[in-house]
């Protein structure tokens, strides 16, 4: 009479926390002496960060400040993919960073392989940008979660919808 238990594996970035981290980082940048008179800016456009600064060195410092604030706000920095540094208007440089939302096919395959390699009696289904894992034993599901947490994945994953 045991019914199936399940959970979902997702990869999401909380955009409101990202916006909060950007605001806090910009406040710090405006008060820092080494950024006095610079044209440094961080903005959020849909699911993309845009970092602008005077030169590459200041851009790297800007990125370090932002990453520190994102970590304090609990945002996974693994889910940020930085683009190339490109020249922008007014002698500044720009870098775009994409916020990865959801699990792509390649990472879904890696995760399902990890689940299969555990040898437990669980089923995994890829559903769009998430993975549903189901099984009769809650202990098996917890072992799957532990195995996925131990794995070195290129994205940060969360576990939701325990049933």
From Swiss-Prot:
Pfam families tied to this protein: DUF520 (PF04461)
InterPro entries per the UniProt record, alphabetical: DUF520 (IPR007551), UPF0234-like_C (IPR035571), UPF0234_N (IPR035570), YajQ-like_sf (IPR036183)
Keyword set, alphabetical order: Nucleotide-binding
Gene3D superfamilies attached to this UniProt entry: 3.30.70.860, YajQ-like, domain 2
GO molecular function, one term: nucleotide binding
Keyword Nucleotide-binding in record: yes
GO-annotated cellular components: cytosol
Alphabetical list of NCBIfam families matching this protein: PRK05412.1 (NF003819)
Record function comment: Nucleotide-binding protein.
Family (UniProt): Belongs to the YajQ family.
Protein name per its UniProtKB record: Nucleotide-binding protein GK0742
Species annotation: Geobacillus kaustophilus (strain HTA426)
